[in-house]
């Protein structure tokens, strides 16, 4: 399944929109803010013969407000702080917001008025850059900072988990799970390695000398790709989908043949791909854990399901139909509420963050 036209966050600002339900991603951005600040400020102590007059910043898979606006604010404030420390003139800042064509860029750009009001004395500009980050997006040596939060773990296509005869090997599931065949994990891991390598390979010529890239991925802590905290969401939705199959609302074949184009890598997997691809040196790498169990905003099943729905619904509705989405997520909420009572829900959100520096003296074909 080609996903370039169907992977995007829920549009607009309605009840089930990404705008209203992106709280977890904002927590991830806040938790990783020091790493982003350090990467931004390192741009001002490289081999540049003169202070930068323009800083070009790309946000890959930006989605829509409030996530990219928060990242944008961190970049601006980091540059203001560093220029104040060095006593140098503030450069102009050009933000390039990248996502697939299906992204709701209109809602994103409407939110820029908040940033404009907040940073009246900073000269910044914004533009959209639609396209896939699995290919080239920008001119050579043009970007000083590339940033991406919770995007590059999405795959360019769904992993093919079938037998030699073409029969599905992950029946009743939409992601890896404890009951999945070993082929499911191998196919998904191989797809991630291929796609992540392409992200690195195509960014390398686009980054200026001494350019930095900050990537934040939804990942996992252990070597086990089926650990509970990363598979819980997809197991929950698979159980709800199985219920819809039993009710005759969707075809069983549609469920058995479907796998989400998503992969939660470990820190070791991310570092291994970076080293193998060879375009970047790793300046910083870490696994960041957010507790989402207990008494917090996600302890309400309804709010948690909205958080899941805002990013998973577009790809699910393409496979199973928009007409069953309300029933699907209502059932998922019902299952989640029961899991809460039994203490079976996921309690952690895992992020992998890496800060990369472009290697010098490279040639590209």
Swiss-Prot record:
UniProt cross-references to Gene3D superfamilies, sorted A to Z: Methyltransferase, alpha-helical capping domain, Vaccinia Virus protein VP39
Class in the EC hierarchy, top level: transferase
SUPFAM superfamilies: S-adenosyl-L-methionine-dependent methyltransferases (SSF53335)
Example GO BP: methylation
EC numbers on record: 2.1.1.159
Domain of life of the organism encoding this protein: Eukaryota
Segments traversing the membrane: none
GO molecular function, one term: S-adenosylmethionine-dependent methyltransferase activity
Ligand binding (S-adenosyl-L-homocysteine): 18, 62, 67, 99-100, 132-133
Residue sites binding Mg(2+) per the record: 170, 256, 258-259
This protein's pathway: Alkaloid biosynthesis
Keywords carried by this UniProt record: Magnesium, Metal-binding, Methyltransferase, Transferase
Pfam families found in the cross-reference section: Methyltransf_7
Cofactor annotation comment: Binds 1 Mg(2+) ion per subunit.
Binding site for theobromine: 25, 150, 153-154, 311
Cofactor annotation: Mg(2+)
Reaction(s) this enzyme catalyzes, per UniProt: 7-methylxanthine + S-adenosyl-L-methionine = theobromine + S-adenosyl-L-homocysteine + H(+)
InterPro entries assigned: MeTrfase_7, MeTrfase_capping, SAM-dependent_MTases_sf
Site description Involved in substrate discrimination, residues in chain: 147, 218, 262, 322
PANTHER family, per the entry: S-ADENOSYL-L-METHIONINE:CARBOXYL METHYLTRANSFERASE FAMILY PROTEIN
Function as written in the Swiss-Prot or TrEMBL entry: Involved in the biosynthesis of theobromine.
Membership in a protein family: Belongs to the methyltransferase superfamily. Type-7 methyltransferase family.
Name listed for the protein in its UniProt record: Probable 7-methylxanthine methyltransferase 4
Organism: Theobroma cacao
């Amino acid at each position: 399944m080609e996903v370039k036209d169907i992977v995007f966050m829920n549009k607009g600002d309605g009840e089930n929109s990404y705008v209203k339900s992106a709280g977890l991603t904002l927590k991830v951005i806040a938790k990783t803010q020091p790493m982003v600040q350090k990467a931004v400020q390192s741009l001002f102590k490289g081999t540049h013969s003169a202070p930068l007059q323009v800083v070009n910043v790309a946000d890959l898979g930006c989605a829509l407000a409030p996530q990219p606006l928060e990242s944008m604010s961190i970049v601006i404030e980091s540059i203001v702080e560093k220029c104040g420390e060095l006593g140098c003139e503030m450069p102009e800042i050009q933000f390039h917001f990248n996502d697939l064509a299906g992204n709701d860029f209109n809602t994103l750009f409407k939110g820029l008025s908040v940033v404009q009001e907040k940073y009246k004395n900073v000269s910044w500009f914004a533009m959209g850059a639609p396209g896939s980050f699995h290919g080239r997006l920008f001119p050579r040596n043009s970007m000083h900072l590339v940033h991406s939060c919770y995007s590059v773990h999405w795959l360019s296509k769904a992993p093919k988990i079938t037998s030699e005869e073409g029969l599905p090997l992950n029946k009743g599931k939409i992601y890896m799970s404890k009951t999945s065949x070993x082929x499911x994990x191998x196919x998904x891991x191989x797809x991630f390695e291929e796609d992540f390598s392409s992200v690195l390979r195509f960014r390398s010529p686009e980054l200026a000398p001494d350019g930095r890239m900050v990537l934040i991925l939804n990942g996992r802590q252990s070597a086990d790709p089926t650990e509970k905290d990363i598979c819980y969401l997809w197991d929950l939705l698979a159980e709800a989908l199985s219920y819809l199959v039993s009710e005759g609302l969707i075809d069983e074949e549609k469920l058995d043949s479907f796998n989400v184009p998503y992969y939660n890598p470990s820190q070791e997997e991310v570092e291994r791909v970076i080293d193998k691809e060879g375009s970047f040196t790793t300046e910083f790498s870490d696994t960041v854990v957010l507790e989402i169990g207990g008494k917090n905003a996600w302890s309400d099943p309804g709010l948690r399901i909205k958080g899941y729905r805002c990013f998973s619904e577009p790809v699910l509705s393409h496979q199973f139909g928009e007409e069953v989405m309300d029933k699907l997520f209502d059932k998922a909420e019902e299952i989640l509420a029961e899991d809460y009572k039994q203490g079976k829900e996921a309690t952690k959100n895992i992020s992998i963050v890496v800060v990369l520096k472009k290697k010098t003296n490279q040639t590209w074909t």
